Amino acid sequence: DVILAAKQQGIKVDGIHVGQDDIPVEVCREYLGEDSIIGLSARTHDIFEYIKTVDVSQIDYFGVGPLHETMTKPDCGVDLDGKVITRSFEEISKIAQISPVPVVVGGGVKLIDIPQLAQTGVDGFFVVSSVSEADDPKQAAVDLVKTWKLYATVGCKDLIEKQVKL
């Protein structure tokens, strides 16, 4: 609905990220076109099997997480004990190895996590509170990107080239 409303107002929409239970990625692709970026959350108990078997023909990347418990991802899932399911760096590395599309990680990601996260083989990260709750949000964003660039061993060049400049 938001995409259609934005497009009706003449606003350029470069992409969308959807959850597994949101609007189907095929519908997103139909409305946004082949040049758009479409991401899909990969948050299941059987994440490894899901990533190996899901149809990725309509998506550009998987969003994986959370790395840490965070208020911005209250619906990310809980285990049988009611504890929020988070992903370890080891799990994230395995996901990056088996995924047929680029992987980005989010959910509680902080600057201190970036060096280790960059070494997992994922293609990027996404944050909310690390920037929005910072005393200087612009500097926080700059620090995150600089640190990533310093430590990253893998990067999705095609996705970066499509990235919208802020």
What are the roles of these predicted feature ranges?
Residues 11-30, 61-78, 114-147:
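Glycine-rich phosphate-binding active-site loops on the catalytic face of alpha/beta enzymes
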Residues 40-84, 95:
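Histidine/lysine/aspartate-rich catalytic loop segments that bind and position anionic ligands
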Residues 20, 27-44, 80-111, 144-159:
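Alpha-helix-loop-beta-strand connector modules within alpha/beta enzyme cores
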